[in-house]
C-alpha cells in the first residue's frame, strides 16, 4: 500500500471548494479501507454513486487499468448493456432514494466476485432501513456491517450470512 503517501499529497492538493458541502466525508481509515477492498476485489469495472469526495482518488488508484465511473445522479449513471458491475460504492447518506435506485440497477449486473460498499448505514433511520433492505435482497449472500460501512458479497456458492464487525 505504498501509494498512501502519494494519495495523501494529491488529496491535499485538491481544492476543497470543488467538493459539495453537506456530504459525509470519509475518514482516512475509511479511504484506506476502500483502497484495500478494491485491491482485494480486483474489479474490471468500478462505479461510485453519490457526492464527489476525495475517496475517489483511493478507489481509482487501487487497481491500474480498471474502468472507474462516478455518478452524482441517476442521469449520470450510464452502463453499457451486459457490462458487469464488479465494484459499487454507494455514498450519499442524504439521498437514500438515489442509492436504492442505483443498487436496483446494478444488482442485476453482479458477478459472483462483485463487491458493493455502502457508506453511512447507521447514519439515519432511513439509511438503517435501506441497509436492512439490502441484507434481504435475493442477490446478496454475505454482508458485513462495519457500522459506518456495509459490505455486500454476491457469490451464490456462499451460505447466506450477515456479520457485524467492530471497525
Segments the model singles out, each with a brief description of its role:
Residues 1-112, 122-167:
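A short alpha-helical cap/connector motif
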